[in-house]
Design a protein with these regions (language model features):
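Small-residue-biased structural context
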Residues: 1-141, 145-392, 396, 403-405, ...
Length: 444
């Protein structure tokens, strides 16, 4: 991969940005490239968004469809072992896309049939069927959440931070188009079928385009970058988010290879001297040599069960962890450098109000949220950091879960008053809202 090639790719997108027609750019692209890797696309977007070229995140989002179409017939495939095995995250991801496309086709056919149907009784049944199929199709949001919360953090660790931002922004646009389409479907027969079909096709066009981007660009980046350990982590954390329409037919358990070499009979021997130094005999082609050195002291490993001063008493690390995990709320700590550093484990991952997984730990808090919420996240962090407020409180009702959720973002300061980070705690207060007496002290 050469810098020149990346610059040409960048120039092509800048031409589009400045009004060039896709046809004229296509000709130059075909004349220049015999194939383009997903890594190059990633680097190109990163360069565009972080240069002084004038291209912004929003511009790249607008160009996303255009450049994806340009690359459609020129993306090099990547072969990686095990990806077609049932339960592998890549296989699961592709199987979900197949199931989602099938649901989309069913909705499209129902709409076409509805348009030509005249029997009122049949039309009523078809309306019910449309709502059911749209609900099934709506599970794409689970597919997107797993992508955003499990794939994107690992991509960022490998330096691919621009593609997640762009794709997450487009995901949110698709979600909005779906909600609009669902609303018009539910408004039948009051809404005209032509409006319903137009809203659905607006969603379907972007949705099918995203499937291409996922499988022809996103997965190529992942397959070029991710290790087997990365895929194992994703597979282990996927249950917390669930699956769209279908579940993996089996658990993926890859064959692990050990990279620890067996000790050789001729391996160098060591012996400790009186003064604590170590002598080591090394075999080389020129003969044996003896070297003497002072070994590095091993760091003491903290005992998680040893008691130590803790606030107004004594606790072990293990006890402190148990207490945090038994608090009736979800806790997240973001340190003063805006890094997501900790969350407690008080409920199964699939039952969390705000889902958290180990792969999110260590990320910048801004990358943990959809682009549309970025300004609000920045405002909260800045307000708490600068002392404008000690805390921010929010609440909302979740009808689907039967919960009334209360969220608090509180500034954390040390004894000197220095800002150390933000503590978020989330709890379901619906049980407290249902208390209708002034007194209860029974133990039944």
């Amino acid at each position: 991969m050469t810098d020149e090639r990346i610059h040409i790719l960048r120039d092509i997108l800048l031409e589009l940005h400045n009004g060039a027609s896709p046809e004229s750019v296509q000709e130059r692209f075909d004349a220049t490239f015999t194939g383009v890797s997903a890594i190059e696309i990633s680097l190109m977007e990163h360069e565009l968004m972080n240069s002084d070229s004038g291209v912004t995140f929003e511009d790249v989002m607008e160009l996303c469809d255009v450049h994806a179409n340009l690359f459609k017939n020129a993306v090099k495939g990547v072969e990686v072992e095990d990806t077609e095995h049932p339960g592998h995250p890549v296989r699961v991801f592709k199987d979900e896309n197949l199931a989602l496309r099938a649901a989309l086709i069913r909705v499209r056919r129902l709409l076409d049939t509805y348009e030509s149907m005249e029997d009122e009784e049949m039309l009523a049944e078809m309306r019910k069927g449309l709502v059911r199929q749209m609900g099934l199709l709506g599970q794409f949001d689970i597919h997107y959440q797993r992508k955003e919360e499990l794939f994107f953090p690992i991509m960022e660790r490998y330096g691919h931070d621009s593609p997640p931002k762009v794709m997450w922004g487009v995901d949110d646009q698709i979600r909005e188009l779906y909600q609009k389409a669902l609303g018009t479907v539910r408004s039948l027969p009051e809404a005209s079928i032509s409006i319903v079909k137009a809203d659905f096709e607006a969603f379907a066009t972007e949705f099918e385009s995203m499937i291409f981007k996922e499988e022809s660009i996103l997965l190529m980046i992942l397959l070029e970058s991710f290790t087997q350990d990365d895929w194992i982590q994703i597979a282990e954390e996927s249950d917390a988010y669930g699956y769209a329409i279908i579940r993996p037919s089996e658990k993926w358990v890859p064959e692990r290879k050990s990279f620890v070499e067996k000790k050789s009979v001729e391996e160098a021997s060591q012996s400790e001297t009186v003064d604590g130094q170590v002598q080591q005999v090394i075999d080389t082609p020129e003969g044996q040599f003896t070297i003497t050195f002072t070994p590095k002291e091993k760091e003491a490993v903290m005992d998680r069960n040893s008691q130590q001063a803790f606030g107004n008493g004594y606790l072990s690390v293990e006890q402190a962890n148990l207490i945090l995990n038994h608090l009736p709320m979800e806790i997240t700590f973001v340190n003063k450098d805006d890094i997501f550093q900790y969350y407690n484990d008080n409920t199964p991952a699939d039952e969390m109000i705000f889902k958290r997984t180990p792969s999110q730990v260590g990320r910048n808090v801004e990358l943990c949220h959809p682009p549309k919420y970025l300004e609000k996240v920045k405002a909260i962090m800045q307000g708490l950091r600068e002392g404008k407020k000690d805390k921010y409180e929010m609440w909302f009702k979740s009808e689907s879960r039967g919960k009334f959720v209360h969220v608090t973002y509180a500034a954390v300061h040390d004894e000197t008053g220095e800002f150390q980070g933000v503590l978020e705690y989330v709890q379901d207060i619906q049980p407290y809202r249902e208390i209708d007496t002034d007194y209860y002290r029974e133990i039944e």
